[in-house]
From Swiss-Prot:
Its cofactor is heme b. Belongs to the peroxidase family. Peroxidase/catalase subfamily. GO terms for cellular component: cytosol. Its EC number is 1.11.1.21. This is Catalase-peroxidase. One of its GO terms (biological process) is hydrogen peroxide catabolic process. Keywords: Heme, Hydrogen peroxide, Iron, Metal-binding, Oxidoreductase, Peroxidase. Residues 267-286 are annotated as: Disordered. Bifunctional enzyme with both catalase and broad-spectrum peroxidase activity. The active site is at H99 (proton acceptor). Homodimer or homotetramer. InterPro entries: Catalase_peroxidase (IPR000763), Haem_peroxidase (IPR002016), Haem_peroxidase_sf (IPR010255), Peroxidases_AS (IPR019794).
Length: 723
């Protein structure tokens, strides 16, 4: 806003108003610049809670039974401003919980329900989430009542779980413990499209081959949770849709049986809404008028609620009794022939060719009126795809099997992004350990830590071997879904022991030394691996003239191969590691951007990333012993040399093929080689500011101290028992 515009707008008395508008940002001017913002989100400045507040402690004081009673009572307390279908909000609440959890994708662990992110853009305004703003607003009195003891993230999912129970399903259990965020997530890549529901072609190598969908995406179009219910790119074809369903659910970590159960169970209750014209709907919540107070898709042209509401555009229920858990979905699917029709909103849907009136569901407002049921193209895929059909027929013949399979799959869906069972809170946490929870047995704490460290120090392992092995064990941790990490020592099991990024030959050499030490000492291998890294760092710090004890908390357990889902762990395989200066192959995304993504998943800040990279380089931990970025002649000493030499203007940096040479500015002699990951710490203005701190003459001890703190954070990232 220019001064002239301010005057013409009524002499705005402050100039800072322009800064609240969408102006030209640094990323607009320099779109290829490294965007470090993803490392600095969800900090204390955006969190309104007191500094000492712990949601995980607060939720333990909740009257869980009372909350469930209130949520169940809400199901049949229809409100005139958004009336419940058939007097029961169950279908709406299930869809809300489903779409919150269903945004999860296994490739990077992002999405999902564990942060309450459905409250914020873009998810709150996705076309597929239309009218879920009403569901959350219906829940507000309960959230208001229980306050800080009940997060939105927990409440959203709990509402779906209780909805199923209120309609007759015996659920598998429920765990509280999801913590709210307070602004939109900046790290999640939802796709490159610039318009909602753009054709699928933009995110596939070939739409005919769903496996070519761009990673880490799982939904077929921008703004959808799963697949297009009308068919691939809105064109009905159940077999083509089946292929997309299979790929999409696989990318969420679901197999074919779970996929069929979830599809059937999700469509046993509730209905779709398309009895009207979509063009009568107002903007989504983010684009709505201020007077709408955060609600979107408001219809001010027609009645727009109840039987006249429009959401997906498809219109109708799937079963005869949409507020009751039963086997009606498969009775309907296999009990009729189906034909393509258009809904009142113009959406493709399948309707029965012939059906008895008593088999039709009643109208949502008038039980004397019967309405034709519908199936989406995804539902027809359960019938037409040979593999899905076989599973569907088995469920049709055995309703108890469907109930059991669905209850477990639903539990998996709504807890998949919560990490190990140790993070679940509440009286309904199932006792059974499930393999997708990455179970780890309890560790031991009663051994002599100093004696173990002494054995490690005398083992003959090098500093680089000890530090690199501990790092590789811990670096798999993802704060997105709390998977991975050093606890369990799965680095010694398939598939991790064979990952190229873990240097299998070097790994086996180190394990052959550390495993006997663990056995002799009564410690877990997981603990000994981390301790070995700590020993290496302490030795390297001492060589730099700094005496330091790296913090250590015993108690990690050792997982077994039987506890490990090898296929499920495949998504955690590192294909790059900027901290060890390695990429598996050339990628479209730059190495420094890959490092940034890994850093965010590990929960590190830009400053922590900087100090760790500088320290790892001088410790000689590069993958394969590569010399790139090792700007020191004292490898194995935890010195500032990486930063000192990177920022030294007596040096000049020149491209040399895929890498760079650091040459003496006067003699042109090659002193070191480097990668883009190394040089970005001198090139990016923010990272250079951090690098200069660690290059200063007065910061040797600070460098060591900060490195140790960041290292300990990585080693303990999955120690949920300590938090």
């Amino acid at each position: 806003m220019s001064a002239q515009n301010i005057q013409s707008a009524g002499k705005c008395p402050v100039m800072h108003g322009a800064n609240t508008e969408v102006g030209t940002s640094n990323m607009d001017w320099w779109p290829k610049a490294l965007n470090l913002d993803i490392l600095h989100q969800h900090d204390t400045k955006t969190n309104p809670m007191d500094e000492e507040f712990s949601y995980r402690e607060a939720v333990k004081t909740l009257d869980f039974a009372a909350v469930k009673r209130d949520v169940e009572a809400l199901m049949t307390d229809s409100q005139a401003w958004w009336p419940a279908d058939w007097g029961h909000y169950g279908g709406l609440m299930i869809r809300m919980a489903w779409h919150a959890a269903g945004s999860y994708r296994a490739a990077d662990g992002r999405g999902g329900a564990n942060t309450g992110n459905q409250r914020f853009a873009p998810l709150n305004s996705w076309p597929d989430n239309a009218n879920l703003d009403k569901a959350r607003r219906l829940l507000w009195p309960i959230k208001k009542k229980y306050g800080n003891r009940l997060s939105w993230a927990d409440l959203i999912v709990l509402a779906g779980n209780v909805a199923y129970e209120s309609m007759g399903l015996k659920t598998f259990g429920f765990g509280f413990g999801r913590e709210d965020i307070w602004h939109p997530e900046k790290d999640t890549y939802w796709g490159a499209e610039k318009e909602w529901l753009a054709p699928s072609d933009e995110r596939y190598g070939s739409v005919d081959d769903p496996s070519t969908m761009e990673n880490p995406l799982a939904a077929v179009q921008m703004g959808l949770i799963y697949v297009n219910p009308e068919g691939v790119n809105g064109k009905p074809d159940p077999l083509k849709t089946a292929a997309q369903v299979r790929e999409t659910f696989a990318r969420m970590g679901m197999n074919d049986e779970e996929t069929v159960a979830l599809t059937a169970g999700g469509h046993t209750v509730g209905k779709t809404h398309g009895n009207g014209r979509a063009e009568n709907l107002g903007p989504s919540p983010e684009g709505a008028d201020i007077s709408e107070q955060g609600l979107g898709w408001m219809n001010h042209k027609t009645r727009g609620i109840g039987r006249d509401s429009v959401t997906s555009g498809i219109e109708g229920a799937w079963t005869t009794h949409p507020t009751k858990w039963d086997n009606g979905y498969f009775d309907m699917l296999f009990g009729h022939e189906w034909e393509l029709k258009k809904s009142p909103a113009g959406a493709w849907q399948w309707e029965p060719v012939d059906i008895r009136e008593e088999d039709m569901p009643v109208d949502v407002e008038d039980p004397s009126i019967r309405c034709k049921p519908i199936m989406t193209d995804a539902d027809m895929a359960m019938r037409e795809d040979p593999i899905y059909r076989k599973i569907s027929e088995r469920f049709h013949k055995d309703p108890a099997l469907l109930t059991e399979t669905f209850a477990r799959a639903w539990f998996k869906l709504i807890h998949r992004d919560m990490g190990p069972k140790a993070r679940y809170i509440g009286p309904e946490v199932p006792a059974e350990d499930l393999i997708w929870q990455d179970p780890v047995p309890a560790g031991k704490t009663g051994y002599d830590v100093d004696a173990v460290k002494a054995k490690i120090a005398a083992s003959g392992l090098s500093i680089a071997e000890m530090v690199a092995t501990a790092w590789d064990s811990a670096r798999t941790f993802r704060q997105s879904d709390f998977r991975g990490g050093a606890n369990g020592a799965r680095i010694r099991l398939a598939p991790q022991k064979d990952w190229e990024g873990n240097e299998p030959a070097r790994l086996q050499k180190v394990l052959a030394v550390l495993e006997p030490i663990a056995a002799d000492s009564g410690a877990s291998v997981a603990d000994v691996i981390v301790l070995a890294g700590n020993v290496g760092i302490e030795q390297a710090a001492k060589a730099a003239g700094v005496n330091v004890t790296v913090p250590f908390a015993p108690g990690r357990g050792d997982a077994t191969q039987e506890m490990t889902d090898a296929d499920g762990f495949a998504v955690l395989e590192p294909i790059h590691d900027g901290y060890r200066n390695w990429v598996k192959k050339d990628y479209v995304v730059s190495a420094e951007e890959l490092m940034l993504d890994r850093t965010q998943l590990m929960g590190l800040t830009a400053a922590e990333m900087t100090v760790l990279v500088g320290g790892m380089r001088v410790l000689g931990t590069n993958h394969g012993g590569a010399k790139h970025g090792v700007f020191t002649d004292k490898v194995g000493t935890l010195s500032q040399d990486f930063f000192v030499n990177l920022t030294d203007m007596n040096n000049v940096w020149k491209p040399a093929g895929a890498h760079y040479e650091i040459r003496d500015r006067k003699t042109d002699a090659v002193k070191w080689t480097a990668t883009r990951v190394d040089l970005v710490f001198g090139s990016n203005s923010i990272l250079r500011a951090y690098a200069e701190v660690y290059a200063q003459d007065d910061n040797q001890e600070k460098f060591v101290r900060d490195f140790v703190n960041a290292w300990t954070k990585v080693m303990n990232a999955d120690r949920f028992d300590l938090k």
